[in-house]
């Protein structure tokens, strides 16, 4: 119901950045990451918006199931930004996202070889698929979101 009310407010006050921000925040709370990112991007374009909104969509999308969307958003921001700090941040984020994509692909290879997804990332080394695990240069360490899950066991994320 909160989202519905906020959307009504947005229709009445289309230039108020706080309203799409709060709509996005509410979507974030119910794990609808694509919708949350859409509203954060919308808020970022409005007058007076806080600077963090411009790049927050990349972080939000990285929490969802499709890292490709986060990569595409980071690449879009990198290509369109004239601010060196944003450029540097997006380069770092892209490396981080692509490392997670790499690990997800390696997890799929693991499943082909072993018949299941790994319970721990270290199993990728133990089974000779990788010689070492990549370092998480941006966050606090990569982890499996659903260790051993038959369908989603490939998913890798990082907290930062």
Where are each of the predicted segments found?
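Low-complexity, acidic interaction segments enriched in glycine
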Residues: 4-12, 17, 21-29, 33-46, ...
């Amino acid at each position: 119901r909160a989202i519905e009310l906020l959307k009504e407010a947005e229709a009445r006050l289309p230039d108020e950045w706080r309203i799409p921000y709060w709509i996005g925040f509410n979507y974030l709370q119910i794990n609808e990451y694509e919708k949350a990112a859409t509203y954060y991007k919308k808020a970022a374009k409005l007058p007076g918006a806080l600077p963090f909104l411009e790049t927050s969509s990349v972080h939000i999308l990285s929490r969802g199931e499709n890292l490709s969307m986060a990569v595409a958003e980071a690449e879009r921001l990198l290509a369109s930004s004239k601010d060196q700090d944003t450029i540097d941040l997006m380069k770092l984020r892209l490396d981080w996202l692509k490392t997670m994509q790499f690990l997800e692909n390696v997890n799929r290879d693991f499943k082909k070889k072993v018949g299941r997804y790994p319970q721990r990332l270290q199993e990728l080394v133990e089974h000779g698929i990788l010689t070492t695990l990549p370092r998480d240069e941006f966050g606090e360490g990569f982890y499996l979101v659903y260790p051993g899950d038959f369908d989603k066991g490939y998913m890798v994320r990082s907290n930062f």
